[in-house]
Amino acid sequence: MAPKKGVKVASKKKPEKVTNPLFERRPKQFGIGGALPPKKDLSRYIKWPKSIRLQRQKRILKQRLKVPPALNQFTKTLDKNLATSLFKILLKYRPEDKAAKKERLLNKAQAEAEGKPAESKKPIVVKYGLNHVTYLIEQNKAQLVVIAHDVDPIELVVWLPALCRKMEVPYCIVKGKSRLGAVVHQKTAAALCLTTVKNEDKLEFSKILEAIKANFNDKYEEYRKKWGGGIMGSKSQAKTKAKERVIAKEAAQRMN
């Protein structure tokens, strides 16, 4: 059988829009003294306070310059879901604040005055302070070390992942020294450490440890070789691409 010929369907003509000749089209002129320009992001032209200006410059420099692997590993932080479950456990083991300590000491003093035996059981709490955390890692007492990604100067903690790996202690890098500080009633904290957990939390804690080991301890060799930075700005990238196009064009002409 011969193929059927397609029947052409007549395209519908769109009705022409009737414009009133009294209303003239006047395209906007956005030059000086002209119409107001459309709204756009002008944040790069704002005169920021010095502290914010330094933050912005530091961020740009980290993108432009080549960042060595030891520093670049602090850009690889724990993912949001795992960080949420980790902080839930850390908050369970917060150290006592001033009010709780005062109440405990008062109760202890009252018990001693009444001749009752005072409770001498040591509570399980999160350990903090860089020297204390380092000592616990060296003594192999630490079960998990949590390091902040934005410690300033970074030299304070840059060696800590290597020490944790050498002592085979699970470690992770999380966002926010202030978030770590909030756990231990401080403004900021460079590193936190857990030495043990209660029996009811052991199952959940072991799952978190497995995930952290897979993300950090097992990938240490990979992070040790990976440099960061070297990303140029949009203008610089455009110039480079234009140069490459010219070079490619000249090479093609020579070949012909």
From Swiss-Prot:
Keywords from the UniProt entry: Ribonucleoprotein, Ribosomal protein
GO cellular component: cytosol; cytosolic large ribosomal subunit; cytosolic ribosome; plant-type vacuole
RNA-binding among keywords: no
Region (Disordered): 1-20
Domain of life: Eukaryota
PROSITE patterns: RIBOSOMAL_L7AE (PS01082)
Biased composition, class Basic residues, residue ranges: 1-15
Gene3D superfamilies: 3.30.1330.30
Protein name, entry field: Large ribosomal subunit protein eL8y
